[in-house]
Structure formats: structure tokens, C-alpha cells
UniProtKB/Swiss-Prot annotation:
HAMAP family tied to this protein: Ser_tRNA_synth_type1 (MF_00176)
Notes on the domains: Consists of two distinct domains, a catalytic core and a N-terminal extension that is involved in tRNA binding.
Protein name: Serine--tRNA ligase
Function: Catalyzes the attachment of serine to tRNA(Ser). Is also able to aminoacylate tRNA(Sec) with serine, to form the misacylated tRNA L-seryl-tRNA(Sec), which will be further converted into selenocysteinyl-tRNA(Sec).
InterPro entries: aa-tRNA-synt_IIb, aa-tRNA-synth_II, aa-tRNA-synth_II/BPL/LPL, Ser-tRNA-ligase_type_1, Ser-tRNA-synth_1_N, SerRS_1_N_sf, SerRS_core, tRNA-bd_arm
Residues binding L-serine: 235-237, 289, 389
Assembly description: Homodimer. The tRNA molecule binds across the dimer.
Encoding gene per record: serS
Length: 428
């Protein structure tokens, strides 16, 4: 969430910056609520002071042998009025907090201003798409022909947007995840983590999925008097980032760089009819996530580094890609700046997103109270959090299958994966 003080004191500026991402802040409503908050705050403090002053006079009256009943009645009346004002103030603060939790992050000044994805800005390309002397097939046809992708049984077992992988395709999928983890832990300095696939509501509030995007989640257990509800993770960003929720980290521990390979689960609400064929948009998919927790002054450089780490996976696999910086109107709810990495898919003759790398600055940290403390500082400060896919395993599999296809329907195994696949040079 945004800094409440900044929101209160710079309401018009905040509204202008949020408007660049298509979010309309109700300035009039917030202004009225803030005026009411100030009024209630003053009234509460004045009532508290009056009650305290009159309460002190009770002892003095008793010492003089005076009747204290009228004073006691006055204190009681003030107490009732004070309790009513406190309840009204608490309700108002809850309303303000609810509004604050629904307001997206402010775009960084370096993010290009634009309305939608058509105004994203390409910053670089790597590799040259291969030219084929035969008609290219998509990953669905190639995978089904070698018996590795089984959509029919996935529909029978569960429903649409699920997959059963078998044989050499399943092995390649596993090899990709292992390759990514090894690269990030041995060359990029990340610590591997094994995390829960079910998270509570506090965790989802911390990273920004709740309260606004509950319909995108698979909820497995509703909240009860005994505890919070549980939901399947939409990304390992949630458990990894929440490791520092309600925590004060020593400055010497920073930066903290974490990675995890997990299944991810998304309802894909609002995606009806999009990417219905193949592995591009699934309810369950594997992803290797990258998370960095850094000091504020280092977060923009950390974003460049994290994005480069994700790009390195594609470079080592020999997959052409381009990197774009998202315009303000296309950024995610909690992001201040985002790079999307898009891999080349020959069958679609276009680039498709395979990684999204974002700097959340202190937006998540404020929601989570994730802080760090320098030895020279009296008070702890909010961390900056970053995350990105390094990479989405299923989409990387799609890219490998399509870019490395041969005329006979076989698939060449990229050199980087051969050590993970028993030395196989081809599958199919």
C-alpha cells in the first residue's frame, strides 16, 4: 500500500500519477473522509483530556468532604461520549484503510506513460529467429505426435486448462526446472527455498493478491473462528516474500535473494476464450520464481540485475527473445516498474511473455511490515521487494519444443539440457 501520510498530504499529486495507469482516485471522497478523521481525532483528544482533568478533581473533592456524585456522573457521561467517538474513529480508519488497500502502486518516473500494452517500449532483443525449410508445427501437434502431451486425459481427470505430460516431454519439463534452479543458485547467488503451496489470507494481503484479486485464486479452506482461510499459491512470490513479513532484517543480511520451483495455480478469471489451445495459459503450471529483498537505494539496480538473470536462462537455451518495459497502463497492481521478457514462438510467428520482472519498491513491505535496520539508524526502514519469473517452466518448454523442432517431428535437445536428460540429443 501507499504511504498514508503521502496519500493524505499529496492527494492531488497521487491522483495524477495514478491516473497514468488508468486508476481514478476518488479525491473528493478521500478529502471528506480525511477532514472527518481530523475532526474526530481532535474531538477524541479533547474528550480524553476533559475526562482526565475532571477525574483528578474527584480525589480533591473527597478530601474536602464534598459530594462527588455529580462529578462521577460527569466523568461517566464523558466516558460514554469518548467511547462513541473512539468507535466512530475506528470505523472511519477501517474505511480509510480499506480504500488504501485497493489503491495500486505509484508508477516510477522512469516507467513510460501509456494506456495499454500497445504502448510498451521494447528495450532490447537477443538472438535471431530460425528460418525453417519446412512447415512449422505448434507445440501441441509436436507434443501429441511423440506421445508427450495428453490434453484429452487431463480434461477427463480434471477439466480444461490442465495437462498430463509423459515420457521424454515430462523429462524435459523436469530438466528445465532443474537447469533454472542450478543456474540461479550457482551463478546468480540465490538461495533455494522449499515453500508451502497453501498460504493464508495475511500472506495474500501482504503481496497484494487480496483483497482485490480474490477471484483469481483457488480457495481451498474458508476462514473460520479457528483460523484464516487458505488458498493455493498463484506464484511462489507470495510465500517467498512473506518470509520477511513482520520482520526486521539486519542491514548486513541484505540483499536477500531467494528462488523456488513450485506449481502455481490461477483461476484465469477474465481470460475466457484466450489461449485455449496448448500450454500457454493453464490453471496449474510450474514456475521458477526469483525474489530479491533490498535497501531502497538499490532496488532499481536490483531490477536490472534480476531481469538479466531471467534473460540468461533464455540465452543459455538459445531461445530468441525481446525485453519490453511496461507502460503505466499495463503494469500490475503492486508494481512501480516492470520488464516483460517475451520469447519467440515460431508457430505463432510472434513473441509471447515468458517472464515478468517487477520492482514493488516499498508497496508490499508496508503491507507486510517488512523492514531492515542499519546500525546507525534509530528506527527500522521499509525494505524494497522485487520479483520475477526465472522462468515459467511450461512456457519455456513450449519455446524449446517449437524452436528446436525438426522436419521429421523430432525435437533437438538444447545443449544446456543434455546433462539433465542423460545425454539425449533428440527426443521423439
Amino acid at each position: 500500500m501507499l504511504d498514508p501520510k503521502f496519500l493524505r498530504n499529496e492527494l492531488e499529486v497521487t491522483a495524477e500519477r495514478l491516473a497514468t495507469r488508468g486508476f481514478i482516485l476518488d479525491v473528493e471522497r478521500l478529502g471528506k473522509l480525511e477532514d472527518k478523521r481530523k475532526s474526530l481525532q481532535v474531538a477524541t483528544e479533547e474528550l480524553q483530556a476533559s475526562r482526565n482533568a475532571i477525574s483528578k478533581s474527584i480525589g480533591q473533592a473527597k478530601a474536602k468532604g464534598e459530594d462527588v456524585a455529580p462529578i462521577m456522573a460527569q466523568v461517566g457521561s464523558l466516558g460514554e461520549e469518548l467511547d462513541a467517538k473512539k468507535a466512530e474513529l475506528a470505523s472511519l480508519l477501517d474505511e480509510l484503510n480499506s480504500i488504501a488497500m485497493s489503491v495500486p502502486n505509484l508508477p516510477d518516473e522512469s516507467a513510460p506513460i501509456g494506456a495499454d500494452e500497445s504502448e510498451n517500449v521494447e528495450v532490447r532483443r537477443w538472438g535471431t529467429p530460425k528460418e525453417y525449410d519446412f512447415e512449422v508445427k505448434d507445440h501441441v501437434e509436436l507434443g501429441e505426435n511423440i506421445g508427450g502431451l495428453d490434453f484429452k486425459n487431463a480434461v477427463k481427470i480434471t477439466g480444461s486448462r490442465f495437462i498430463v505430460m509423459k515420457g521424454q516431454i515430462a523429462r524435459m519439463h523436469r530438466a528445465l526446472a532443474q537447469f533454472m534452479l542450478d543456474l540461479h543458485t550457482t551463478e546468480h547467488g540465490y538461495t533455494e527455498a522449499y515453500v508451502p503451496l497453501l498460504v493464508n489470507e495475511d500472506s495474500l494481503m501482504g503481496t497484494g493478491q487480496l483483497p482485490k484479486f480474490g477471484e483469481d485464486l483457488f480457495h481451498t479452506k474458508p476462514a473460520t473462528e479457528e483460523g484464516q482461510g487458505l488458498s493455493l499459491i498463484p506464484t511462489a512470490e507470495v510465500p517467498l516474500t512473506n518470509l520477511v513479513r513482520d520482520t526486521i532484517v539486519d542491514e548486513e543480511e541484505l540483499p536477500i535473494k531467494l528462488t523456488a520451483h513450485t506449481p502455481c495455480f490461477r483461476s484465469e478469471a477474465g481470460s475466457y476464450g484466450r489461449d485455449t489451445r496448448g500450454l500457454i495459459r493453464q490453471h496449474q503450471f510450474d514456475k521458477v520464481e526469483l525474489v530479491q529483498l533490498v535497501k531502497p537505494e538499490n532496488s532499481m539496480q536490483a531490477l536490472e540485475e534480476l531481469t538479466a538473470h531471467a534473460e540468461t536462462v533464455l540465452q543459455k537455451l538459445g531461445l530468441p527473445y525481446r525485453t519490453v518495459v511496461l507502460c503505466t497502463g499495463d503494469m500490475g497492481f503492486g508494481s512501480s516498474k516492470t520488464y516483460d521478457i517475451e520469447v519467440w514462438l515460431p508457430a505463432q510467428n510472434t513473441f509471447r511473455e515468458i517472464s515478468s520482472c517487477s520492482n514493488m519498491q516499498d508497496f508490499q513491505a508496508r503491507r507486510m511490515q517488512a523492514r531492515y535496520k542499519a546500525k546507525t539508524d534509530k528506527k527500522p526502514s521499509l525494505l524494497h521487494t522485487l520479483n520475477g519469473s526465472g522462468l515459467a517452466v511450461g512456457r519455456t518448454l513450449v519455446a524449446v519444443i517449437e524452436n528446436y523442432q525438426n522436419a521429421d517431428g523430432s525435437i533437438t535437445v538444447p545443449e544446456a539440457l543434455r546433462g539433465y536428460m542423460g545425454g539425449l540429443e533428440k527426443i521423439g
